[in-house]
Design a protein with these regions (language model features):
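Active-site metal-binding motif and surrounding structural segment of the metallo-beta-lactamase
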Residues: 41-87
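Active-site neighborhood of phospho(di)ester-bond hydrolases with catalytic His/Asp-centered motifs
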Residues: 35-38, 58-66, 85-89, 150-153, ...
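Short, well-ordered alpha-helix to beta-strand connector turns
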Residues: 58, 106, 169-170
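Conserved beta-strand hairpin/beta-sheet module of binuclear metal-dependent hydrolase folds
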Residues: 2-51, 138-154
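Metallo-beta-lactamase
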Residues: 89-139, 143-146
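Short amphipathic alpha-helix with an adjacent loop that forms part of the alpha/beta core around
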Residues: 48-52, 118-121, 162-165
Length: 178
């Protein structure tokens, strides 16, 4: 949890992390997103309830890549709550070809491009291309006012470009179980 001016709070909560599933909640006072939905919808709902949030409070799901430990609950959350999903073109295509996720309304997919900022509410999000054995994996750098952190999962290798993208952070969450 970050603290600063009352309106600049930025929070991060790990709901699940590990080879059996990954899901992180990131939020400000007014807007919240999930990074990955790699556990059941029920476990996501329970995890959010533990931090006094509801699935309906989420403004979207940022998908890092298409492996099941990152998308297992994606279809359920999309169908149940109509949550928009943000992912690269390669990841979206791979998700659409993953039968266990089930049918997802194509309107819920929003294509993102590495190194191109996009905004969800008061959160500015920058996808960062990373090395991993997936279609088109990314990490996420998230900023609200003067607070910035990044969430990096399943990083295969790193190079100078990734190191540069991660400069100037207040916090780095590096998931290192891969």
């Amino acid at each position: 949890k970050f603290t600063g001016k009352r309106n600049s709070m930025l929070e991060l909560c790990s709901i699940a992390s590990g080879s059996s599933g990954n899901c992180i909640c990131v939020g400000s006072d007014n807007h919240h997103v999930l990074i990955d939905a790699g556990i059941s919808g029920k476990r996501i709902e329970n995890g959010l309830n533990e931090v006094d949030l509801k699935s309906q409070d989420m403004d979207g799901i940022l998908v890092t890549h298409e492996h099941l430990d990152h998308i297992a609950g994606l279809g359920v959350m999309a169908r149940r709550y109509g949550l928009p999903m943000y992912a690269t073109a390669g990841t979206i295509e791979a998700i659409k070809n993953t039968p266990s996720v089930g049918k997802i309304d194509p309107e819920l997919f929003h294509e993102i491009v590495p190194q191109e900022d996009f905004v969800i509410g008061d959160l500015t999000i920058t996808p960062i291309h990373i090395s991993h054995d997936a279609a088109d994996p990314v990490a996420y750098r998230i900023k609200k006012e003067n607070r910035t952190f990044a969430v990096v999962t399943d990083l295969g290798n790193y190079d100078d470009e990734i190191v540069q993208q991660l400069q100037g952070l207040d916090t780095l969450l590096l998931e290192a179980n891969h």
